[in-house]
Design a protein with these regions (language model features):
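Amphipathic alpha-helical segments
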Residues: 1, 19, 24-27, 141-176, ...
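Intrinsically disordered, low-complexity and often Lys/Arg-enriched segments
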Residues: 1-10, 14, 189, 196, ...
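Short, flexible domain-boundary/linker segments around small modular repeats
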Residues: 1-3, 11, 115-148
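Positions in alpha-helical segments
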Residues: 15-17, 95-98, 135-139, 155-158
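Non-catalytic DNA-recognition/assembly elements of restriction-modification systems
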Residues: 16-53, 176, 211, 219
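A short beta-sheet element
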Residues: 55-116, 125-129, 133-137
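Low-acidity, Ser/Thr- and Arg-rich intrinsically disordered low-complexity segments
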Residues: 172, 176-209, 215-219
Length: 219
């Protein structure tokens, strides 16, 4: 988010790029003004079930009770604090993962889009394992538009995410087919160089290396 200046030289809280049908400034809030941050809890007293349990690394196991049912964005309390992810449905979270709920003037999907733009490592409170506190998150200032504009932005961003995910799947399916066709005994790895990602296949039988450049969208 940046500010622009109108013809009267007044600073306006609006993005440089915007859908043309929307006008008016985005309003500044603290996160705590528009949603609540929920704490995860221990799940070991629960029985096995069909409700997923999430930690900072993603899915862990399934239990028979839910901590919350609905749309949410998860954000790590400890560990991977800079990888928020969206979920819709019943779930349980452990105490290393926060979740959002009780939205007021902000939609759950736009919350996810907004959380993707925050430099969470900037708010790290530990010298060892990265950590965030609920109090710190709640005080972060954000700018949000009206609900109609939020919905349009979120619809576009989720469509892009889906397209990227599809391209990832197609790439790895093609790669597996290539490996199978060559009957390779390989080590499959990837590395990033600048904005580009490369995948390389090491064949221990024939002793050769194949390096495949991949779009920066596929990691």
């Amino acid at each position: 988010m940046t500010t622009t200046i109108n013809n009267e030289h007044k600073k306006l809280n609006v993005p440089n790029l915007r859908f043309p049908e929307f006008q008016g400034e985005w309003i500044t809030y603290k996160i705590k003004d528009v949603l609540s941050i929920g704490n995860g809890r221990d799940y070991k007293h629960l029985s096995n079930g069909e409700i997923p349990v999430f930690g900072t690394g993603g899915y862990m196991t399934s239990v028979d009770e839910c901590l919350y049912d609905g749309e949410t964005t998860f954000i790590g309390r400890k560990g991977s604090i800079n990888k928020p992810f969206y979920y819709n449905g019943k779930f349980w979270t452990v105490d290393t993962l926060f979740y959002t709920h009780s939205f007021n003037g902000i939609t759950p999907k736009f919350t996810y889009c907004l959380f993707q733009t925050i430099n969470w490592l900037k708010y790290n409170e530990a010298s060892g394992v990265p950590s965030l506190s609920k109090d710190t998150i709640e005080k972060i200032k954000i700018m949000i538009p009206g609900l109609e504009e939020q919905n349009k932005i979120a619809k576009l961003m989720f469509a892009l995410d889906e397209r990227i995910s599809t391209q990832k799947i197609l790439f790895w399916v093609s790669m597996r087919s290539f490996i199978a066709s060559k009957s390779l005994a390989i080590l499959l790895c990837s590395f990033a160089l600048g904005s580009n990602t490369f995948v390389f296949l090491i064949d221990f039988k024939e002793r050769f290396l194949i390096v495949v450049p991949v779009s920066s969208d596929v990691k």
